[in-house]
Every structure is written in C-alpha cells, then in structure tokens.
Amino acid sequence: MFYFISRKFYDQFKYGILTDKTNKLLKNNVYTFDVDIQMSKRQFKDLIETAFSVKITSVNSYVKSSKYYRSNNFEGMKKYYKRMFIKLNDLETIPFFSCL
C-alpha cells in the first residue's frame, strides 16, 4: 500500500521549495511545494495527509505563468507550474523539512 501511495506521490509531486522566503514561512508551519499543473487542492491535501500522516489546516495555490527566454539564436519559453502552500497544525511537522 505504501508503495502505491509513494509512486502516486512522485508522479504528481515535483519538489519542495527551499528559498529565503519559504524558510521564513517554515517558522509559521507553512510548507511550499511545486506540483503537477492539473492537481487540485483537494487531491494535494489528501496526498500529503496520507504520505506524511499529518493534518492540514489550509491549502493555497497559484499558477506561475511561463516566461520567454533567449539564448544565442534560440528562443523559447520556460514551463509554467503550480505552487502549493500548506499550513499544518502547530504541533505537527513534515520530517523532511524539520531537519533543515
């Protein structure tokens, strides 16, 4: 069962975000993730709650638009992505981020 959850988790989950701004949010127990563009808030909430065994109080998200870039003679666009912010209860943490 855990293999199925972790396989599903890694298919839709891109990576956790660790920047200066997100480190400030970690003090308020808010975690930041980049996910698949088609994932909904409810799906993400259920996925995180089952994968890490935590209780989520709120989920916020936004879609970052793509940007144009040019390198020598090549022009293209960067991919757009969805960023999710989750807030946990005060007593709970996600083990991966707690060691940072």
Swiss-Prot record:
Organism phylogeny: Eukaryota, Discoba, Euglenozoa, Euglenida, Spirocuta
Protein name (Swiss-Prot/TrEMBL): Large ribosomal subunit protein uL23c
Localisation: Plastid, Chloroplast
GO MF, any single term: structural constituent of ribosome
Gene: rpl23
Protein family per UniProt: Belongs to the universal ribosomal protein uL23 family.
InterPro entries: Nucleotide-bd_a/b_plait_sf (IPR012677), Ribosomal_uL23-like (IPR013025), Ribosomal_uL23/eL15/eS24_sf (IPR012678), Ribosomal_uL23_CS (IPR001014)
Function: Binds to 23S rRNA.
Keyword Ribosomal protein: yes
Keyword RNA-binding: yes
Organism: Euglena gracilis
Keywords, comma-separated and alphabetical: Chloroplast, Plastid, Ribonucleoprotein, Ribosomal protein, RNA-binding, rRNA-binding
Superkingdom assignment: Eukaryota
One biological process term in Gene Ontology: translation
GO CC terms of this entry: chloroplast; ribonucleoprotein complex; ribosome
Main location: plastid
Subunit and partners: Part of the 50S ribosomal subunit.
PROSITE patterns recorded: RIBOSOMAL_L23
